Amino acid sequence: MLNKVQIAVVDDDKIFQLITNKTLHTIEQVGTVWQFYNGEEALIYLQEHAGEPDQLPDILLLDINMPVVDGWTFLKDYLGLHDQLRKDISIHMVSSSIDPKDIERAKSTPMVQEYIIKPITKDKILDVIRQKAEKA
């Protein structure tokens, strides 16, 4: 992969954000990392930069349970925004929920590539990056 992968992390857990951000910055293939603390912040950013592929993430790591706009609502709203985006964003749900209903719901949502149970490891992030590179 020649270009560095841009990643957005959408999660209200500040400790998860801190650890994930530090981990992402140890990976050579990772370029820009955006941090959003709820789905609304991420949706606003995506809307504002819909026509600017360089300002959009390649991969979006999305939590389920967040204030303001949760992961499920984000996905519903993202569906309406998707056609405006000038980049194909790979969405991976990352949650501490082991509820089979959440896992099944994520797996049955076409735009969700994968359901990852926290904590997310460096190896898992590298796997997500490889998956994205294979689709490019």
Model-predicted regions and their roles:
Residues 63:
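Active-site residues of response regulator receiver
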Residues 60, 114-115:
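Two-component signal transduction core modules
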Residues 118:
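A Lys-centered signature of the CheY-like receiver
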Residues 66:
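Receiver (REC) domain active-site loop signature in two-component systems and cognate sites
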Residues 35-45, 71:
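Helix N-cap/capping motif at the beta->alpha junctions
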Residues 73, 87-92, 98-114:
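Alpha4 helix (beta4-alpha4-beta5 surface) of REC/receiver domains from two-component response regulators
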Residues 44, 72-85:
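Short amphipathic alpha-helix used as the core "switch/output" element in two-component signaling
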Residues 5-15, 20-24:
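Conserved acidic segment of CheY-like receiver
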